[in-house]
């Protein structure tokens, strides 16, 4: 076996309508498959899914449900008051979070997205969805599409070949940090039984002005501490001593109500700008059954570390004394700052009529910026890494007028009007240097895999949540020491390592991820700290380039979106002033 690795080190470069936010309500996601199937999914048989089960290899097999689920999303400028402070925001259909998109494993999704913003393009990414056979719908401006121009509509179409918990969000600059996100839940089997599905619970930090107003300050170096946190789009901010007319009060805590003896499935999602949470519910144990879109062997914990973009599905049994309990976000104060870090809380009640605050005491948080231990994240479907290939790429850093991050000595800077996939469709083979393209092509029949190593050489000690589009990846190493191209690969875990689509790059360490070259496309890899992505901490893999154009099915729609964007840009009020993502 020839061992090779894609190696990248990380350095830093300094280069000078009205709607009220509402928390997502409980939505018991009842199984929708036929009850005449061989194995019905129920509270006592969650591993079943008709003719399929939790043991089915979903990378190779997708149910043919014959069902198409259609949704309409309007991207809007709105005025919202999620925590008692009124501010402008960007919303899907007027709310933060946006409406839930749900489907069953194997369903086809058709989602019409209309851009009703006055002065911005947009695009929607379906986080964690591999987009097999639908690469042009990954939703990244400058990579897989041109932005959707104001007044234009783009219809995204893809099949749900995976199942579990994820989210959709704008990938146009910093828009998701201004409210453009919502839950995407694909029903399927699970590794443990439960009675009720609570649905998505979002954790995030929240500013009291648009992040675009903060951007000029943020890119000068250390990002500012934001004013508050939200849990499922709501929280309380103390306006009692404020003279600010926008501080109107009236916020509320996110609440859950449990019935004693019932087991609940919670779908936890960190959609923060610059936040790391350690979720917990006082006096309750979390049974973790999935990370990102990968079912895992269940394990129990008192607290759960959740990086930006990551999702965990947990089961919580209502077995405590009937009382009120704090639901704790547990802000990672050693990872980033927030003015109301201690306020990242919600309330669990056993009596829905109760209105008093809990007096419960939580466990001591671990207080780390890391992921959950890799030893805990064991995929239920056991898969190994095969023969892989190597590319070594070094980096450098420089200082100019403002802060940017670099990968391979280059900070990502995309041209929204000329996405990578369009260049490939037009038979272009040379890409701009600041597109940060790494070509991946299988040249040896025994090397179907690539291992990509990203190493933090900045000395800052910041942990970065790294997200790859187009693939679940295998976490073969996640270390706080220095990577050695000659020695470190010998310690890679190639036997059923954790699989997911977001994993933390340790500060001053390295992250090694493996994935199979089985999905031709232009796939973005980036830090999911919003400031860092805008500051260029990203690159893209052009995988199996010769197969990309022939894999595109809706080329007319793809080209029409670019034509409409190019017709709009001469009147564009706000020019691109970040990486584009």
Swiss-Prot record:
Source organism of the structure: Botryotinia fuckeliana
Binding site for Cu cation 1: 125, 467
Main location: secreted
Lineage: Eukaryota, Fungi, Dikarya, Ascomycota, Pezizomycotina
Residues bearing glycans: 77, 93, 120, 232, 283, 343, 408, 427, 441
InterPro entries to which the protein is assigned, alphabetical: Cu-oxidase-like_N, Cu-oxidase_2nd, Cu-oxidase_C, Cu-oxidase_fam, Cu_oxidase_CS, Cu_oxidase_Cu_BS, Cupredoxin
Binding annotation for Cu cation 4: 464, 527, 532
Gene giving rise to this polypeptide: lcc2
Residues reported in the UniProt entry to bind Cu cation 2: 127, 169, 528
EC number(s) stated in the UniProt entry for this protein: 1.10.3.2
Transmembrane annotation, as ranges: none
Any single Gene Ontology cellular-component annotation: extracellular region
Disulphide bridges: 146-562
Role summary: Lignin degradation and detoxification of lignin-derived products.
Catalytic activity, as annotated: 4 hydroquinone + O2 = 4 benzosemiquinone + 2 H2O
Binding positions (Cu cation 3): 171, 469, 526
Keyword Glycoprotein (UniProt): yes
Record protein name field: Laccase-2
Localization in the cell: Secreted
Domain (Plastocyanin-like) ranges: 74-191, 197-353, 413-547
Protein family per UniProt: Belongs to the multicopper oxidase family.
Cofactor(s) needed for function: Cu cation
